[in-house]
């Protein structure tokens, strides 16, 4: 049944050690160029469930939803965690919001991160 398939998919996804983020091109290219070192997600139950208390090995950043042959639309980084911050950003409206700031520095080796 569809419910059983969905349950199996969720179990497999939970066992995954990779955090996947799909981004708009503007943000993907800024990360790839090293100009953007954090990707923001609203601090809400959806993202709390996916980030808090979880240990990931890799951060997979994708420009949209790339097809199998579009490797140039994927950035594969070690996962360095996140910080909870309050920011103001046009994407979230005019008021300050609480976010998960997921670390995504492509130049991490140059900065001596482990």
Describe the predicted segments one by one.
Residues 1-13:
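Short, Lys/Arg-enriched N-terminal segments with co-localized hydrophobic residues
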